[in-house]
Amino acid sequence: MTRIKRGYIARRRRTKLRLFASSFRGAHSRLTRTMTQQRIRALVSAHRDRGKRKRDFRRLWITRINAVIHEMGVFYSYNRFIHNLYKKQLLLNRKILAQIALLNRSCLYTISNEIKE
């Protein structure tokens, strides 16, 4: 059997790993085995939190809309507001409604008055 020389392949792999883990603390940025484990964990967390971020923003938008609706003194809740929007076929998603609630409350007042039963 002839000897196989791998050359720089492993060194290149570890260099890429070191660049990825350079911002980690302690041994997680110095030791190759712990760097590898921490990299896997970081990528798992990133993947999980991409889905979580979508849920968090939706919760934030709903909270903002609900707060403005209650501040207006309207006698119906957030879910009744959304239900009336769908019945009147107004295509405004929660993100846009939350921006309107923050930046232009009078516009949201007129929308709520239009969709009132």
Swiss-Prot record:
Predominant place of localization: plastid
Record carries keyword rRNA-binding: yes
Keyword Transport attached: no
CDD domains: Ribosomal_L20
Pfam families: Ribosomal_L20 (PF00453)
Keywords on record: Chloroplast, Plastid, Ribonucleoprotein, Ribosomal protein, RNA-binding, rRNA-binding
Function: Binds directly to 23S ribosomal RNA and is necessary for the in vitro assembly process of the 50S ribosomal subunit. It is not involved in the protein synthesizing functions of that subunit.
UniProt family annotation: Belongs to the bacterial ribosomal protein bL20 family.
Name the UniProt record assigns to this protein: Large ribosomal subunit protein bL20c
Organism: Nasturtium officinale (Watercress)
Lineage: Eukaryota, Viridiplantae, Streptophyta, Embryophyta, Tracheophyta
Gene: rpl20
